[in-house]
Amino acid sequence: MAKRIIYNEQARRALERGIDILAESVAVTLGPKGRNVVLEKKFGAPQIINDGVTIAKEIELEDHIENTGVALIRQAASKTNDAAGDGTTTATVLAHAMVKAGLRNVAAGANAITLKKGIDKATEFLVGKIEENSKPISDSTAIAQCGTIAAGNDEEVGEMIANAMDKVGKEGVISLEEGKSMTTELEVTEGMRFDKGYISPYFATDTERMEAVLDEPYILLTDKKIALVQDLVPVLEQIAKTGKPLVIIAEDIEKEALATLVVNRLRGVLNVAAVKAPGFGDRRKAMLEDMAVLTNGQLITEDAGLKLENATLEMLGTGRRITINKETTTIVAEGNEKAVTARCDQIKKQMDETDSSYDKEKLQERLAKLAGGVAVIKVGAATETEMKDKKLRLEDAINATKAAVEEGIVPGGGTTLAHLAPILKEWADKALSGEELIGANIVEASLTSPLMRIAENAGSNGAVIAENVKSKPFNDGFNAATGDYVDMSAAGIVDPAKVTRSGLQNAASIAGMVLTTECIVADLPEKKDAAPAGAPGMGGDFDY
């Protein structure tokens, strides 16, 4: 296919146009008074949404070159979402501000490579400062505050996540389900999560989120490699009759057996998903036994004289719901408390008897996974559109609170970055010179952009607010919900340090890449053939 090649300033300007379109669409959602965006869907009702990364994923432009700019800035949002689970809009706004300021300097003759070095050095300095100013999370009030801000100022959501963390622990599993009523409820049930995802992406039932969600599945647990599909046929036939889904957790599944499962899944013969068992050697077997206890099934192992080809439905475990993504598997089980408690007591006994600190640590991990359970938040709403929006906000809030537990919290609402701007300027003036200093100044100028956008979305003058905040103590910022200047930590307006850090790093990375772009190679738009002329008497003269 013929290609279109664009050089220098023209290439960078084309990218900039795409970046402008995406940044503007996403930035309207920032802050407590951010607006919603409506996404038109080919099928079903339109989606009303307030989530930066979801909006970014939907935007595709007709112009291939501009679309490349969209894809670049979308990457900043996606990477921030992968690392911290929130802060995608902030990352987009920051990247946009850095690109705009940087392109002005490149157009004026600055060397893009030296600018990028300055941007990287400034980012490294800021990451250290964010770490310095972060405070560890100490109580459930701070957790609730974090969740509230991430969910778009929904206090009920913040409280619910804090309660969930109290019940399952800070490392515990919090899962989301679509509820059957209008209210959002919290329930704690038996369950566990382990760090292995699906073997093949073809098992995903939700292709947008790349997740496999199976309700009330049978669970086949085995510690052997499944090489031949013939071993599975008897049990697959029994399950096909019940019409229920199946999850296979095995040491491994070889190509032939895997291909057969995938084909059956794609043809709709059997709703199945396969996962590799976690751990190695004896630990793997012990974890599979834990899962068997949890799901009220049996581990099919030759040590116990059980063979895969002789497996029956009675040997399989059952669960309420299993959610599998590319990295983790979450099992939500229920109604098996006695057996789980007995198994936990057995693990505690083993911990008392062992002298090895390594074994103790691994047993402790197993105990935490088994005893912690799963907090299930059932999302309730009046309409499906509201349900989807609520679910995305809850997901952001859960991710934000987990990030806060990991790396602590900093003053929110764009305050931290705005206060770091003069600190960065002071350091850069001493430590850098020439075009590297200009690169650091580009970062410094962009640091107030999230705060300015939050203020503008609330109907205030962003530039004035940003200057006022910079002159105040580090903890003081602008509360866009009330229009006052307050102590952000005391007012409960906090952001996880990890979210602020990830957003800044990803924005700087994308800005550096755009500034150092000198040439774009893209597909030429295809010429569409003219439509054939209509037959006589078949004119296009319609009244609508």
UniProtKB/Swiss-Prot annotation:
Major location (coarse): cytoplasm
Catalytic activity: ATP + H2O + a folded polypeptide = ADP + phosphate + an unfolded polypeptide
Subunit structure comment from the entry: Forms a cylinder of 14 subunits composed of two heptameric rings stacked back-to-back. Interacts with the co-chaperonin GroES.
Source superkingdom: Bacteria
The protein's name in its UniProt record: Chaperonin GroEL 2
Binding-site residues, ATP: 29-32, 86-90, 413, 479-481, 495
Compartments where located: Cytoplasm
GO annotation, cellular component aspect: cytoplasm
Pfam families in alphabetical order: Cpn60_TCP1
Nucleotide-binding as UniProt keyword: yes
Enzyme class name: isomerase
Family under the similarity heading: Belongs to the chaperonin (HSP60) family.
Keywords: ATP-binding, Chaperone, Cytoplasm, Isomerase, Nucleotide-binding
Annotated function: Together with its co-chaperonin GroES, plays an essential role in assisting protein folding. The GroEL-GroES system forms a nano-cage that allows encapsulation of the non-native substrate proteins and provides a physical environment optimized to promote and accelerate protein folding.
Membrane-spanning segments: none
Organism annotation: Prochlorococcus marinus subsp. pastoris (strain CCMP1986 / NIES-2087 / MED4)
GO biological process terms on file: protein refolding
Its EC number(s): 5.6.1.7
PANTHER family xref list: 60 KDA HEAT SHOCK PROTEIN, MITOCHONDRIAL
A molecular function (GO) term: ATP binding
